[in-house]
């Protein structure tokens, strides 16, 4: 019995011999029955055409696998489960399907069909190669999500967009610099304003620019300031608004406030926007200016009387340094670092807990070891906390050090314990960093292939992708016609746009199924 993929017609049995029902046929040649020809067997139903119990041979780079068609038909939306998709790989001479793919990976791919949807990566196959195989065989997003969860990857959060067109355009303009040229220009302006604000914050602390009333000074300067506070208070308050640093700071705050308000009114969810840590940093970055401005106005109305404690005012001014974290909105590196720290909070908590135990243990030990030496600087266990922290982190400032033999032994053990304690959670943190880094890199590579927005924007994206891929050399198996449900091929007079190793088409009707998601069909050979 021979299996012919596509038609799957069984060879007719001989007309003569055998028992059972007589063969059905018809007479040919003239009015009489000169000879008898059996009729071909009836074609199976549409749903049963390929889902029979016949066996099929799959050749993966020379390694032959054999399975039943009904096993593959469990997942008709995949490459092997759809007879039309896998037909292009059929070799009629050898009566088998040939795929020039990774051989060790196909053990897990075939097990996916045999087990009813369980995906397991072979230990000798790298994660990135197995991910490419899942995409090539089109196992679907659900299989990819299961695989990533089994490998310990974090689930990517969806980024909703506003529903209104104008609101969505404004949100993309200020939140996603890579969305368009104007958005990239706004991001550059925002980065420049942040850098100018940080430079001004540092320069105004120089002695020639420093306002002695707001920043610490030497004791003699404090006495001189107190003596002349009554005479110079009003004039200094009057000149504060004409200070160049104040003018530049005001311009920066105007931009920060404008950017924050626009993003707040254009965001898809006000509650989510208010809980975002980056937005809270934006709010904290502009609050010190308004507090300082209110203090200056209160001093002018109070004839130079101090309206706020200098210590509180200096702390408020110090909060301005958090503006540097605003750069993380425009820096992929800082975002990766923040995501790594967030994902490694448990490991960091364990590290701090271990260091806390070590500090208590070794500070107590060194205190009692140095108790008999009057020249020792370890006057109490709390005083030894600083020495224990510096020693366990292998910094070693040298301001406090043991002098006795017992103290030196304790110090040696403290340093060794610190090295071991810090080294334990480092591999996990590095693994998280590598994951976020490779995910960001993979996202940037696939961003040029992904279909973003509606169908009406596809033509321009297709033209750009054709230009980008015009010089690439592709094998015959790289271009795959992806057929989605509900698509009418007669409605596609235009040339399909090709994304590396996949082919996608899009109509201009209002059917959401007429657009093919490039992320779902992206394959690699």
Curated annotation (Swiss-Prot):
Residue positions where Phosphoserine is found in the record: 470
Cytoplasmic side: 1-184, 267-277, 332-347, 432-525
Transmembrane segments: 185-203, 245-266, 278-298, 313-331, 348-367, 409-431
UniProt-listed GO biological process terms: action potential; corpus callosum development; optic nerve development; potassium ion transmembrane transport; potassium ion transport; protein homooligomerization
Residues modified by glycosylation: 229
Localization in the cell: Cell membrane
Site positions for Not glycosylated: 228
Signal sequence extent: none
Membrane topology type: Multi-pass membrane protein
Post-translational modification: Phosphorylation on Tyr-449 inhibits its channel activity.
Reaction equation(s) it catalyzes: K(+)(in) = K(+)(out)
Residue numbers covered by motif Selectivity filter: 394-399
Annotated spans, Disordered: 1-23
Residues bearing a lipid moiety (S-palmitoyl cysteine): 267
UniProt note: domains: The N-terminus may be important in determining the rate of inactivation of the channel while the tail may play a role in modulation of channel activity and/or targeting of the channel to specific subcellular compartments. The segment S4 is probably the voltage-sensor and is characterized by a series of positively charged amino acids at every third position.
Family recorded in the similarity comment: Belongs to the potassium channel family. A (Shaker) (TC 1.A.1.2) subfamily. Kv1.3/KCNA3 sub-subfamily.
Protein name: Potassium voltage-gated channel subfamily A member 3
